[in-house]
Amino acid sequence: MAALLLLPLLLLLPLLLLKLHLWPQLRWLPADLAFAVRALCCKRALRARALAAAAADPEGPEGGCSLAWRLAELAQQRAAHTFLIHGSRRFSYSEAERESNRAARAFLRALGWDWGPDGGDSGEGSAGEGERAAPGAGDAAAGSGAEFAGGDGAARGGGAAAPLSPGATVALLLPAGPEFLWLWFGLAKAGLRTAFVPTALRRGPLLHCLRSCGARALVLAPEFLESLEPDLPALRAMGLHLWAAGPGTHPAGISDLLAEVSAEVDGPVPGYLSSPQSITDTCLYIFTSGTTGLPKAARISHLKILQCQGFYQLCGVHQEDVIYLALPLYHMSGSLLGIVGCMGIGATVVLKSKFSAGQFWEDCQQHRVTVFQYIGELCRYLVNQPPSKAERGHKVRLAVGSGLRPDTWERFVRRFGPLQVLETYGLTEGNVATINYTGQRGAVGRASWLYKHIFPFSLIRYDVTTGEPIRDPQGHCMATSPGEPGLLVAPVSQQSPFLGYAGGPELAQGKLLKDVFRPGDVFFNTGDLLVCDDQGFLRFHDRTGDTFRWKGENVATTEVAEVFEALDFLQEVNVYGVTVPGHEGRAGMAALVLRPPHALDLMQLYTHVSENLPPYARPRFLRLQESLATTETFKQQKVRMANEGFDPSTLSDPLYVLDQAVGAYLPLTTARYSALLAGNLRI
C-alpha cells in the first residue's frame, strides 16, 4: 500500500528534476561524486599539513602555509627523489633545499646578517623551531650563528643602492631555470617578498612594474643586460639594488649574485623568518598579462600558495608522475600551478626554458613524462608539426591546462592519444577556479551542485552595453538560465579572499560586486562570460571587454573565431570589434594567419561565414598577417588590434571589407575606405 502511495511521487520526480534543470546532469553524477571525494580529500590533506606545522612550531602556527616549510618537509620525506630536471641537470628535493638555503643566506647578508667566516650553523630547518627575533632588531638570531650587522655594507650587490630591509620585495627578471627557483625559494626562506617580472618588459612598462610592487632590488639575467642598458640609469635612480644572476662583464655596481650564493654554506636558516604572521599575508607578486593596459601586480598570499599545492592532486596526478612544464615561471600557470602544484604532491618536473614543438615528444620519451601542462597554443603548435615516430611511443597519460580550443582539442587527442585532457579555468588574482574533470571537449568545468558546494561561484546576467550586471527591481543580480551567457562571480570569504593589487586600491575598481544576491554580500568579478548548458558543463564564452554590440546584437569574439578556424587554410584567427564612423557599436574585424602552403580563398571564406554566422556576427573587416600579436603567454592582443583600426593608409597588412551589395569580401582600397567614411559603402 505504501508503495502505491509513493508511485505518483516517483513518477513526478523526473518532471521535477527536468523543471529544475537537473535531469540531464544525472548521467554525470558518478563523475561529480568522484571528484567531490577527491576535492574533500585534498582539502583535508592541506589542512593536515598546516596543522602538522603548527604542532611542530606552536609559536608560528601559520608556518606550514609557507613555501619554505613545504620544501623543508619534502627534503626530509622525499630527500633522494628527483624534484627538477632541466636539460642535463637533475636535482633532488634535498639538493633543492640546500641550493635555496645558500640563496637565503646570500639575501640575509644583504639584509645585514653576519654569518661569520664559516657561514655559521643554524641548527634548525625552515620547518623548525627557534627563538623569534626580527632580523634587523640588532639581536643575534637564536641558534643561527648569525648577527645582524645593519647599516653600512649590508648590501653587497647593488653598489650605491640602499640595503635591503626585512620584508622587502626583490624582483626577478629571469628565464625559467633552476636558478629562478633557488632564488625564489631563498627569498621565501629569508622572509622577503618576490616579484616575478615578465622577461619581455623594458623601458616604461618595466619601471612601472617595479614601482607598483615597491621593489627594492632587481635580479636580472646576464643575457638581458644589453637590452636593459638604456634602463639602468632609471633603475639606479629608483634606488634599486642590482644583481646579475651569472658571470660576465657587468656594468659598474652590478655584481654576480650566483657567485655570492655559491660562496655560502648550505645549512638551513631560522624557520621563523619564513613563518607568516597571517595566512593572508602577501608573499609574492605576479603581474597580470597587460592585454588591456599596463600590467598590475596581483598580491599572492600564503593561503594561495597552500591552495595551489593541491592543484595536481585535484587533477589526479600522483607523486611518481613526471610533469612536463614549458611555461614562463613569471606567470601563475608556470610557477604556482606547475612548480608549487608539483611540490604539493612531491612529484618530478621537467622544466624547459623555452617550448619546442619539434623536441617535445623526444623529451617526453627521454624523461618518461606522464603529465603535460599546457596552454592552448602549445597544443596547436604540436598538432601543426609533421608526424614523427616519437609522438606514438610516449607515456603521457594526462594533459592539464587552459585555453584549448575545441578544434585543436579534437585533433590533439585523435593524433596523440590515448590520453586525458583536463581543461581548467582560473585567474591569477581570482578566488575561483574550475576543472573539467570529465574530459568533455570544449568545457572548462562543471557547475554541479557538489562542485559549487565545495568551490562556490555563480553566473549572473550581464549587459555588455553598460558593462554592468543586470539587477532586478530590488537591486539584486539575477542568475542565468541554461545556455545563457553570464558573468562569472564568486563570493569573497575568509577561505576565498580577494587581495587586490599592489599600487593602490583604485586598481581593483570594478573587481568587487556588492549586494549581489543579498544585502551586504561581496563577490569577486572575474570579468569573464561563461555559459552553463543543460548538462551542467561550463564553456568559456568571452571576456566582457571583448564582447561587443553590432546592429543591436551581442557578438562573442570566441564564437566567431571558432567558425573561422574550421577553414583548413586558416591557421590563426583573432576577432575583435572596431569603431566605424557613423555607426553605433563596433563592427567585427578578424586578423587572419594562413596555414602554409594555402592561399586566402575569399569566396570560400565568405560562403562559410554566411552559412555559419548570423548577419550581425559576420566580421566586416579582414586583416591578413604573417603572425598574430600576442602576449608572452600567447594571449591575443585584441585591444591593440582594435586601436589600430582598418585604415589602409596606416596599415601595411592586406585589408578586406565586406561589401553587402556585392556579397563578397573585397580589398579595402583607399577609395573604398573613403566611400565607407562618406556613407556610400554599406557594411
Swiss-Prot record:
<keyword id="KW-0436">Ligase</keyword>
<feature type="compositionally biased region" description="Gly residues">
    <location>
        <begin position="119"/>
        <end position="128"/>
    </location>
</feature>
<keyword id="KW-0443">Lipid metabolism</keyword>
<dbReference type="GO" id="GO:0005886">
    <property type="term" value="C:plasma membrane"/>
</dbReference>
<dbReference type="GO" id="GO:0005783">
    <property type="term" value="C:endoplasmic reticulum"/>
</dbReference>
<keyword id="KW-0547">Nucleotide-binding</keyword>
<protein>
    <recommendedName>
        <fullName>Long-chain fatty acid transport protein 3</fullName>
        <ecNumber>6.2.1.15</ecNumber>
        <ecNumber>6.2.1.3</ecNumber>
        <ecNumber>6.2.1.-</ecNumber>
    </recommendedName>
</protein>
<keyword id="KW-0472">Membrane</keyword>
<keyword id="KW-0445">Lipid transport</keyword>
<dbReference type="InterPro" id="IPR020845">
    <property type="entry name" value="AMP-binding_CS"/>
</dbReference>
<dbReference type="GO" id="GO:0016020">
    <property type="term" value="C:membrane"/>
</dbReference>
<dbReference type="GO" id="GO:0031957">
    <property type="term" value="F:very long-chain fatty acid-CoA ligase activity"/>
</dbReference>
<feature type="binding site">
    <location>
        <position position="331"/>
    </location>
    <ligand>
        <name>ATP</name>
    </ligand>
</feature>
<feature type="region of interest" description="Disordered">
    <location>
        <begin position="119"/>
        <end position="145"/>
    </location>
</feature>
<keyword id="KW-1133">Transmembrane helix</keyword>
<feature type="binding site">
    <location>
        <position position="543"/>
    </location>
    <ligand>
        <name>ATP</name>
    </ligand>
</feature>
<dbReference type="GO" id="GO:0004467">
    <property type="term" value="F:long-chain fatty acid-CoA ligase activity"/>
</dbReference>
<dbReference type="GO" id="GO:0005789">
    <property type="term" value="C:endoplasmic reticulum membrane"/>
</dbReference>
<keyword id="KW-0813">Transport</keyword>
<feature type="transmembrane region" description="Helical">
    <location>
        <begin position="3"/>
        <end position="23"/>
    </location>
</feature>
<dbReference type="InterPro" id="IPR000873">
    <property type="entry name" value="AMP-dep_synth/lig_dom"/>
</dbReference>
<feature type="binding site">
    <location>
        <begin position="288"/>
        <end position="292"/>
    </location>
    <ligand>
        <name>ATP</name>
    </ligand>
</feature>
<dbReference type="InterPro" id="IPR045851">
    <property type="entry name" value="AMP-bd_C_sf"/>
</dbReference>
<dbReference type="GO" id="GO:0005524">
    <property type="term" value="F:ATP binding"/>
</dbReference>
<keyword id="KW-0496">Mitochondrion</keyword>
<feature type="binding site">
    <location>
        <position position="635"/>
    </location>
    <ligand>
        <name>ATP</name>
    </ligand>
</feature>
<dbReference type="GO" id="GO:0047676">
    <property type="term" value="F:arachidonate-CoA ligase activity"/>
</dbReference>
<dbReference type="Pfam" id="PF13193">
    <property type="entry name" value="AMP-binding_C"/>
</dbReference>
<dbReference type="InterPro" id="IPR042099">
    <property type="entry name" value="ANL_N_sf"/>
</dbReference>
<dbReference type="GO" id="GO:0005739">
    <property type="term" value="C:mitochondrion"/>
</dbReference>
<dbReference type="Pfam" id="PF00501">
    <property type="entry name" value="AMP-binding"/>
</dbReference>
<dbReference type="GO" id="GO:0031966">
    <property type="term" value="C:mitochondrial membrane"/>
</dbReference>
<feature type="binding site">
    <location>
        <position position="528"/>
    </location>
    <ligand>
        <name>ATP</name>
    </ligand>
</feature>
<keyword id="KW-0067">ATP-binding</keyword>
<feature type="binding site">
    <location>
        <position position="428"/>
    </location>
    <ligand>
        <name>ATP</name>
    </ligand>
</feature>
<dbReference type="InterPro" id="IPR025110">
    <property type="entry name" value="AMP-bd_C"/>
</dbReference>
<dbReference type="GO" id="GO:0015908">
    <property type="term" value="P:fatty acid transport"/>
</dbReference>
<comment type="function">
    <text>Mainly functions as an acyl-CoA ligase catalyzing the ATP-dependent formation of fatty acyl-CoA using LCFA and very-long-chain fatty acids (VLCFA) as substrates. Can mediate the levels of long-chain fatty acids (LCFA) in the cell by facilitating their transport across membranes.</text>
</comment>
<keyword id="KW-0276">Fatty acid metabolism</keyword>
<keyword id="KW-0812">Transmembrane</keyword>
<comment type="similarity">
    <text>Belongs to the ATP-dependent AMP-binding enzyme family.</text>
</comment>
<dbReference type="GO" id="GO:0001676">
    <property type="term" value="P:long-chain fatty acid metabolic process"/>
</dbReference>
